[in-house]
From Swiss-Prot:
Cofactor: Zn(2+)
Name of the featured protein: Formamidopyrimidine-DNA glycosylase
Naturally occurring in which organism (per UniProt): Erythrobacter litoralis (strain HTCC2594)
Keyword list, A-Z: DNA damage, DNA repair, DNA-binding, Glycosidase, Hydrolase, Lyase, Metal-binding, Multifunctional enzyme, Zinc, Zinc-finger
Gene that this sequence comes from: mutM
Physiological role: Involved in base excision repair of DNA damaged by oxidation or by mutagenic agents. Acts as a DNA glycosylase that recognizes and removes damaged bases. Has a preference for oxidized purines, such as 7,8-dihydro-8-oxoguanine (8-oxoG). Has AP (apurinic/apyrimidinic) lyase activity and introduces nicks in the DNA strand. Cleaves the DNA backbone by beta-delta elimination to generate a single-strand break at the site of the removed base with both 3'- and 5'-phosphates.
Zinc finger extent (FPG-type): 236-271
Entry EC number(s): 3.2.2.23, 4.2.99.18
Keyword Metal-binding in record: yes
Cofactor stoichiometry and binding remark: Binds 1 zinc ion per subunit.
């Protein structure tokens, strides 16, 4: 599933060609998406000018001059394609401008879009109870200490809770915990202040590096221009069970099931 860096990379790629442009045509092709396209989507977008693009957690945002925002989620396998040579049967949403064509391609159809008033964006149900952005100033030691106080739940699962930190997913939580040397099963309420400081730094470093690398291309994900992200070449633990820890401390990466997902860690250096 595309996570925060992949969505950020997607938004930046789209912005190069879509920001400031007038939408001349909108086509929706599939009625059987995870959620149906909102009524009136084509009418709302066609003729509108895109004033800016943004991201909140794992959601992409396309803001128009009609004070409306199209929210998109890439689901499990979604990606945007810019000026594709051919139409793909999985291109479920097409947006055209005078010079470019944008296709939202999603083979597994778990992605979706919504249309909301820009001024009411913070009240949209998916955002209303969401925690701070991991790359923003609101993610502080004080915030994490308050959010984790008394929590017996494993720190890995706490970090996946979007009400605690917005936008973190399995890949980058596993990687950040390794960098911070924190065991993923450790109770969130027992992580020390010093360790939380290291964790915040690790989260930001991992996410920022992945954005620079264009994200992690594992299965279906590619950048809008078709290029693959290469952060996967930097994985320290994710998907590396049975391989030696890169700290050369004699540890071997292990995997176990946690909260319905796989968790990877090094039992030697993560305590």
């Amino acid at each position: 599933m595309p996570e925060l860096p992949e969505v950020e990379t997607t938004v930046r790629g789209l912005a190069r060609f879509l920001q400031g442009e007038r939408i001349t045509r909108t086509v929706t092709n599939r009625p059987d998406m995870r959620f149906p396209f909102p009524d009136g989507l084509g009418q709302a977008l066609t003729g509108a000018t895109v004033v800016s693009l943004g991201r909140r957690a794992k959601y992409g945002l396309i803001h128009t001059d009609r004070d409306q925002t199209m929210i998109f989620h890439l689901g499990m396998s979604g990606r945007w394609r810019i000026d594709p040579d051919e139409t793909d049967k999985h291109d479920h949403l097409l947006i055209e401008t005078a010079d470019h064509r944008f296709a939202l391609c999603d083979p597994r159809r778990f992605g979706w879009v919504d249309l909301v008033g820009t001024q009411a964006l913070d009240q949209w149900p998916g955002f209303a109870a969401m925690g701070p952005e991991p790359l923003g100033d609101a993610l502080t030691i004080e915030h994490l200490r308050a959010a984790l106080s008394g929590r017996k739940q494993a720190i890995k699962l706490c970090l996946l809770d979007q009400a605690i930190v917005a936008g973190l997913g399995n890949i980058y939580v596993c990687e950040a915990l390794w960098h911070a040397r924190i065991h993923p099963r450790k109770a969130g309420g027992r992580v020390s202040k010093q360790a939380l400081s290291l964790l915040i730094t690790a989260i930001r470093d991992v996410l920022e590096q992945s954005i620079r690398d264009g994200g992690s291309s594992l299965r279906d994900y590619a950048q809008p221009d078709g290029e693959l992200g290469y952060f996967a070449t930097r994985f320290q633990v994710y998907g590396r069970d049975g391989q030696p820890c890169h700290r050369d401390d004699g540890g071997t990466i292990r995997r176990f099931a946690q909260g319905g997902r796989s968790t990877w860690y090094c039992p030697r250096c993560q305590r």
